[in-house]
C-alpha cells in the first residue's frame, strides 16, 4: 500500500502486520503505543471495524479527537437484500471519507480537486522503456481479476476482448495471484501487442505506468481506482456488485460502467463485496458480450487524448 502515498511530502506511512508484530489485542496496544509517540492530534477512522474501534477507544482515553466513517451499513443491506430491495444509489465512498475529515475540522471539496502530476520517468527507467515501445498506439491497461468469482468476467470472454483490442492498441495486463500471473503470461505469449506488467514491475513501477496509459479496463477492483486517481478513463465491468454500492472509481461517470442486465438478474447487487452468487446466477456474467466491452472501450478511447506522448 505504501507506494500509493509516496507523492505526499507531509505524510508518514506506518506499515502494520496484524498476523505477526501486531497480532491480537496485545498487538493493538503495541500499535497504539507506537502511534501515540507520533504526537497525533486527531484520528480519522476510515475503516470502522473491530480493530480500529479498539484503537479509537485507546485514543479517546487519552483525549485525542476521533471521528469514524459512516459506511451506511443499513442502506447497504437494503440495497443487496433479495426481497424488498431498495434499489437506489448509496453515497460514494469518497464523500464518506470527506465527511470524516470534515468532522475533524479539515473540510475537503472534491468538486475542486486536482489530479496528481504524472511521475517523471527517466529515459533509462524500465517504465519509460516499456512505454516508449507503444509508438503512436494508445495503451489500454486491463486488470481482468478481482478478489471474488462474482466480480470476475469469464476468462474466455475476456480473451476475446484482449484479442480484438490488441490488433490496433497496446495492451498492458495487471494482476497479482499465482494463477492470475500464469494466465497473464498465456495471453502475453499468444498476442503480439500484449505485455505482462504484473510479473515484471513492482507496485511503485506499476502505478507509474498506470498514470500514463490511455484507458483502464477493470473489474470492481483496486487497479481501476488507482487509474482513476490519475485521471485515467476507467471502464468498469460489474458482476454481482453494482455502481450503486458506492465504489465507482473516482470521477468516472455511470457511462463508463458495464453492468449485468437487472431485468434478467434482479437480485444484483447481491452483496457489496461480490462474494455472493445466488442459485441461477452462476452464468450471469456471460450475458455481458465481449462486443459490448469492446465497443465501449473504443468509444471511451476515441474521446480520450493520448497520455503517454
Regions found by a protein language model. Name each.
Residues 1-309:
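Catalytic machinery of carbohydrate-active enzymes
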